Amino acid sequence: MTAVNKITVLGSGIMGHGIAQVAATVGYNIVLRDIEQSFLDNAMKKIKWSLGKLVEKRKMSQNDADSIYGRITPVVDLKDALKETDLLIEAVPEEMELKKKVYADVDTYAEDKTLYASNTSTLPISEMASLTSRPSRFIGLHFFNPPQLMPLVEVIPGRLTDSRTVSISLDLIRNIGKEPVLCKKDVVGFIVNRIFIPLVHEAAHCLDRDTAEMTQIDSAVKFKMAFPMGIFELADYTGLDVIYKASKEMISRDKKVINPHPLI
């Protein structure tokens, strides 16, 4: 069993409200926190819509949907959001300066028992952990978009993360019905983005060299390599702005990881 009962999710965007819904679905009590009530209102509407779709498809009853929705409490005040929480999952935008400010504020109010987790897709866990008062109880939990559907979660310990935090995190991910993959080293891009981001750039190079057309490249990986989506299709779904930021971050930390294409 995990030592987690109450979870606070910081950030109510696509990832934040998705993570909140996933965890609430299996019975966790969730506080969803953002800096403005309007952001939270929008997030709760999206959660209600998502649960409504599951009811329409007869994947859950209306009573179950209402119970899940009722386990998510939207809160603006950070101090209130962190009361008695066992696990904080930070899902704010991928900007290190913003995360520095967030963790400085969190450290002011978080209780000693609270574990910290970041949903970052590229930023180094060890560096973020060093910004806090508890680097041994800091870990990366990288969910994929949309969290309600994607089964994989990368679990990334920092250099100082202790074994108990790793164990609790792995148990949590399994408890919410996801498949954890443990990254044994806090490397640039972790596992998935270390493979996927360079792949997008290489596909762009193939396109640029007139080796193949975009549809041919996507068809090749879908029908020959059994990818569920084409490389460009997935890049478009992910968002080229997201891929650009991830590429920039990865290159700044290890120039050998990517052969960057100027269009990306």
Where would I find each of the regions flagged by the language model?
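N-terminal glycine-rich phosphate-binding loop for ADP-containing cofactors
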Residues: 1-264
